[in-house]
């Protein structure tokens, strides 16, 4: 193999401006990290909430949370990205649709962060649900026997151990 890499290509200017290819790559890395961190935050908050709701004894809380997980885990992430970017704006009311379709500077960023965050929230919800259900039932019974409400039992006993 006698191929020699031309690493100086990264220091050359792009044809459309004064930037170099290396500056483009560093900028792309920054946007990638920003999307990843935003999606991580969305996924962690929503996933923890939905995972907790999936273990709630009231069906009006657990059924929508289960539907959320089933919806977002069973649609591939690439399909969700396309749906959020191209289909959802068409389904919104006219004024809101017009606002979403206008040329915003960070429309792609918001769409990607939301789609990845919502997709990953379903996986985190499953992990939280599994963690809660792995605890012995005696833990929640003991909390309720001590006079805790169901919310207090989750907050002070179940979730810290899950």
Predicted segments, located by residue:
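Transmembrane alpha-helices and adjacent helix-loop boundaries
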Residues: 1-162
